[in-house]
């Protein structure tokens, strides 16, 4: 045995020990944390999958790797564990006790957003502290007040007319109409109108706008981006991968937003106080320099564009597409709706009077039922248990626990909505509907209710009224007997709703 061999062996062993020690040092905290989460955590006795108790990666597995949505598993898990409360993460639970919804989302609620869930969000969605949120919401509120939304009806009418012309051109060419894209174009144009004081048109031609193509691509990676944001950024550097396409889409989306923002800012400054159309950019520029606290609370408009496009257009377009599907899938619903629209055709075709359209009872029932059954924001939006803790059933939850009750848990509760998987607008009409509006919660409730609720209702009512008053349509495409969807923070249909225009009833 030579001295050289001993020295070489000692050198190899030293590197082995270094690597082993490094691995132990890196993994030990994770292992110890996992053991604590499963066996010693205050939530250890709450039923649920052990993997969910072990790590938040379990939710990521369902949300992104399986691309189905963790929230779609909750109903199965509640049934499997025979419990109204289940553990869905190391520090998160989900409950189906509907009375608990009032506790979390009532006015003046002290249940704050879960920082760990929203840490990679920006703008309005990321605001945890009530003061900052109230300041920003108050700053934007006039843009989304009923009076301001009523004033958007002429723009929406113009956009609908342009869309209808495009739909007729496609029909004349023997094509079907992809309503998902038509509706996304309409809803995005409306929210951009509020974001910028510019006349931005996404509907000049029959081609789908590149801005919308880019946005759709970004939404396919939404869970990855809000969970592990550095991963897509690094992987996007690899040529030829889907992440490279993601990077290209992000660049396209960002370039459009930056160009619109810069042009709007320039025009606003050049106007030197002259009256310009109200918008996010105008309101930001109107902030006074001496109000430092307010300026700190209100983000730069460009930082919040994605949130408003996703929350203000994608959810509305998705819901409206679902409405088209359910109306056209049910001859009785379609007939009842068209009869009502025909009886009031003048307020749609001639006057386009939103104040009258919004009072059509069956139209409103169809919209409420669509919001219920489609659940545009289906996932958990966790809130933190305040000081003092709380008891749900037989389980005590300490302060700091993340608690969710999804809209699905409400919308498909058989005690509130008999036959919950059936599309029944009539449930919202007449004596049997008394008290049901309390559970019309698609836009949430309380201080964090969606700021764009009034805009969404304008679009839903007017778009459905216009198209079903004007066109006879039939479903085509691959939707089949039911709509297949996934949870990408907002719900997304896997198959676009497509229709064939049978007749233009206004010609």
Curated annotation (Swiss-Prot):
Keywords on record: Glycoprotein, Heme, Iron, Membrane, Metal-binding, Monooxygenase, Oxidoreductase, Transmembrane, Transmembrane helix
Principal cellular location given in the protein's record: membrane
EC number: 1.-.-.-
Pathway assignment: Alkaloid biosynthesis; ergot alkaloid biosynthesis
CDD domains attached to this UniProt entry: CYP58-like
CC cofactor: heme
Membrane topology classification: Single-pass membrane protein
Family indicated by similarity: Belongs to the cytochrome P450 family.
Full protein name: Cytochrome P450 monooxygenase cloA
Name of the gene: cloA
